[in-house]
Amino acid sequence: MRLVFFFVFISGLVLGQEKAPFKQFDEVNKEQYALEKKAIDRSKNTALEKTNLRLRLASRYKFQDDLIIALEDKIKQQGESAQLLYLLGGANGIKALQVNKMFSITYVKAMLENFKRALILDPNYLPALEAYVEALCMVPSLLGGDIDRAKQFAAQLMQLDPVQGFFALGYIASIEEQDEQAVGFYAKAFKLLEQQSFCTQDLKNYFAKSSMNLPYKMAEISTALQLSPAIGLCAINHFIDRYTPYDIIPLEWAYFQKAQLLHAIGKINAATDTIKESLEINPAFEAAKKWQRTL
């Protein structure tokens, strides 16, 4: 079963670059969502089948409250797994970003607890390691954040996947405002990708055990730091090719990254066409319009 929800805890800025927002529930679709949900509830499917359908529906419409409930129901029906706990942690993390800070504490604590439980069940589960490192860095210590623990999990990630390990260390360094050190870690990650002949690999298999947002992250860092733009381009092309309504990063942001990477390798006409694609998806995309004016 393909994951219906993909998570990476994203901060507002990394080394000065604006980050893509998560897609959110559109109130315009509220009535249609309610109709589809009612149809599932009235269907003759088994309880588990209904839960899976509710998961897909809530994920597609980005209705976080129902997504959390459906994931909790699935865990009750199937038992805990690292994958389900990771997804539940991610759903709570995004909900925490959507509500008033006063009401976010419950969701933040649930996020950390579920990532922790996921790694107790499977210490080598890469998506949970990636997400937990970033969450521990972003959450205040009073609520359970702990950069020292994040560094320990980053070291564990390094043993399992050195590329992701260097990305994690780079992220931690950027949070600690050690920008030069962060760039050094990211550069090591891209050097490894070059040594792996990344662009010639079967990327579906390459990312099979990683979060679906990892290729976007690779492209984003490549763009921001001007590191290995050809690799960043391969990564973002893979992300776009595999994009579905269940993804949480807006598609226009993927095309925005692609346009900048095309420009970086000297393909100006292709970059111009690609930024137009981004703006066709979202004509109100200010960052893309601002960048387009520089061409």
PLM features: residue spans?
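N-terminal leader/linker segments that initiate helical-solenoid repeat arrays
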Residues: L15-I69, K74-K76, Q83-Y86
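N-terminal signal peptide c-region/cleavage motif recognized by signal peptidases
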Residues: S11-L13
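"A position-specific structural signal for the A-helix of alpha-solenoid helical repeats
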Residues: E49-R56, L87, I94, A131, ...
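Alpha-helical repeat scaffolds
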Residues: Q32-R42, D65-K76, I105-L119, G145-L157, ...
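A structural motif in tetratricopeptide-repeat
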Residues: S43-K44, Q78, D122, Q159-D161, ...
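Residue-level recognition of tetratricopeptide repeat
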Residues: A47-K50, S81, Y125, P162-Q164, ...
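Alpha-helical adaptor scaffolds
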Residues: E134, M138, K204-W253
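Short coil/linker segments at helix-helix boundaries
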Residues: R56-D73, E80, Y86-N124, E130-Q159, ...
